[in-house]
Amino acid sequence: MNRLFKMVSLLLALCLVLTAVPFAYAEDEVIDADLTCTITLGNWPPDTAADAEKALFEGYKATMAKQYPNVTLVPDYYSYSLSNYVPMAKGHTAPSIFQPPFTDPQLLISQGLVGDVTDALEQFGVLDQFSPSYVEMLADENGRIYGLPRDGYVLGMHINIDLFREAGLMTEDGLPMYPKTLQEMAEYGQIIKEKTGKAGLVFPASETYGGWLFTNIAWNFGCVGENALEYQDEDGRWVCNFTSPECIAAMEFMRDLRWKYDILNADATTTDWAGAHSLLGTGEAAMNFAADDSVDQPTANKGLPVDSFALIPFPAGPEGRYALAGGTCYMFSPDITKDQAVALMAYLKVLGKLPFLDEQIISGMRADYAAKRDRGAPVLPAISAWTDAEYNAAKQAIIDEYCNVDMRLYADFFDSISQGTIALKSEEPIFAQQLYRELTAVVQRMITREGADVVKALRKAEESFQEYLDDEYNDY
């Protein structure tokens, strides 16, 4: 059980402790001509990506060709989901590197579906510098490591300023009059719907997305501590709790968003993460629960100008102000060899994902943020995965150089994190995806049936998820 709570501590901190390798190489210097292998890159941009992004990765590939001339890199874009990855891993067709969310590593590790990179990390001189929490999250029970952090995120809310302006919800300073609370969100969304005809809030309620977002709403209604959605009893058994007064109130609020305030997008039950960003970016919705790591989706990808976009803190509820903190990691095929593991660590170093500082890495950072700016994505302060002061200062200086937004549209979001005015909370500690699936079904029922019984639906989901907990953990 200590493993789960140590995993939580890392996500809340959104950082890990690593020190920089004490030397670096010139970009065109051969580092290891003997290393010979092929690696497939699941983190390669898709064919539909902007030319600048594809050029950036071609540059990384060229650098690897100079430093490791006998390592072959094969672009192999892959959009991860647990359901499609498992058969790939079992069928020996998984890419060498891929990018799952922080919810999945322990499951993948326990099932033997990912590759061990411990020895490669030791070869790069960083193995002993990992924080205990990091090891607990991406390691097995023997301390063998299977992944590296890519980035972290904090859930907030994306705003389409054009719709706020059309609805008359602007301050004298020309800033959106954004909602500070969930109640204000409902009321402002109603005004927007009435005055513009567009959805006040896009809520993706397909697959597991609805339950995922609902948990953050539930926390802000008080589903934490002794009222948590899941907890361990005195015997160490995991118990789910969907029928507390707090959870019932949160789900009633969810129902009201559809039937009382009528602010949701019409096709919520079939809307996914990408669809939600599309609706906001194309002006079909004014608000979307989303994080700082996806600000490029409605802007660069869907055409919303950066001066028509804002990122705000997750609205507070009647019993708290929490925001989900999570992230994405790099993990590796279970079939990788020792040489492939070393090549993959070298590749991540070239990408600037390890805290090395040299001219090549700084040049890569510049190219990364320049590409974001050039394709119309907001260039924002980073929530760093590293605590190395020199590395973070260099990165922030480059961000400042390429910043292309009015930071007043983002300041409250970042200030709420740095000043601690919002409490960061990681995802539910055990079988989160199954929990989301059960709660998504309840959300779907609430927003499609006006007279749906909240307590009955939550009790049914509670019984189903408890049976799952018993089968998969308590009685195992």
Specify the residue positions occupied by each region the protein language model found.
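Extracytoplasmic/periplasmic solute-binding protein
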Residues: 141-150, 155, 165, 183-239, ...
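Glycine-centered hinge/linker elements that transmit conformational signals in sensory
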Residues: 186-191, 231-268, 314
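Short helix-initiation/N-cap motifs at beta->coil->alpha
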Residues: 76-85, 180-184, 267-281
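C-terminal lobe and pocket-closing loops
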Residues: 294-305, 319-324, 328-437
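Conserved N-terminal structural module of periplasmic/extracytoplasmic solute-binding proteins
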Residues: 6-9, 18-113, 121-128, 171, ...
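Hinge/lid segment of periplasmic solute-binding proteins
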Residues: 29-31, 101-156, 162-165, 180-188, ...
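Short, solvent-exposed loop/beta-turn-alpha elements that line the ligand-binding surface or hinge
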Residues: 115-130, 174-178, 223-249, 300-303, ...
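Alpha-to-beta junction loops
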Residues: 89-100, 113-115, 198-199, 281-291
